């Protein structure tokens, strides 16, 4: 039941199916897939090997490309770009001139906008509100599993942490580290990362 209408174009090996809608001046091309109840409209582009599916909306001048995935109830709009191996999903919103790329994930109720650049192995989650590249900090490989830890600004102008299956405030993170890794080198690593995040992340009223 997919619809393609207006001046929209679907070309090359691209697929649009399910109840997806592509309209306005939107373009879906290369090997891109748009399906489910996804809507791609305005002057938006989905290309490369990118997938947009679920209840997503891709609008304005947004462009999803590379091997990027946008799914769930996520919205990407404005002049935003999602590329490479990045994922945007859940109820996340990426807009403005924001860029999400490399292996970064933006999910939950997170908002990334303005001139923010979210990249590397960042995991921006939950109530994150990132509109400046100084609103998040990633450290890794770190810890007993050589993983990555992401510290990010929230809509309440506080710092939260995502590390593996852990998600919580900065103090909750430190408490968890002490409980799990107390007395080990990993405790030192994580605590140093937390202290560095406090210095690097800019909260409201702080200059860049």
Which residues does each predicted region cover?
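Intrinsic low-complexity/IDR segments
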Residues: 126-208
């Amino acid at each position: 039941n997919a619809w393609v209408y207006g001046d929209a174009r679907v070309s090359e090996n691209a697929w649009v199916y399910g109840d997806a809608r592509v309209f306005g001046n939107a373009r879906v091309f290369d090997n891109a897939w748009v399906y489910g109840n996804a809507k791609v409209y305005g002057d938006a582009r989905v290309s490369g090997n990118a997938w947009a599916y679920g209840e997503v909306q891709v609008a304005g001048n947004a462009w999803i490309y590379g091997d990027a995935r946008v799914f769930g109830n996520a919205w990407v709009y404005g002049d935003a770009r999602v590329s490479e191996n990045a994922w945007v999903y859940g109820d996340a919103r990426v807009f403005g001139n924001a860029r999400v790329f490399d292996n970064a994930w933006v999910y939950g109720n997170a908002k990334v906008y303005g001139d923010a650049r979210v990249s590397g192995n960042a995991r921006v989650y939950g109530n994150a509100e990132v509109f400046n590249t100084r609103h998040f900090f990633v450290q890794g490989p770190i810890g007993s599993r050589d993983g990555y830890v992401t510290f990010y600004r929230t809509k309440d102008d506080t710092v939260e942490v995502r590390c593996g299956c852990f998600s919580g405030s900065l103090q909750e993170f430190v408490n968890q580290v002490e409980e799990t890794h107390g007395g080990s080198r990993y405790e030192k690593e994580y605590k140093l990362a937390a202290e560095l995040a406090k210095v690097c992340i800019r909260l409201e009223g702080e200059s860049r």
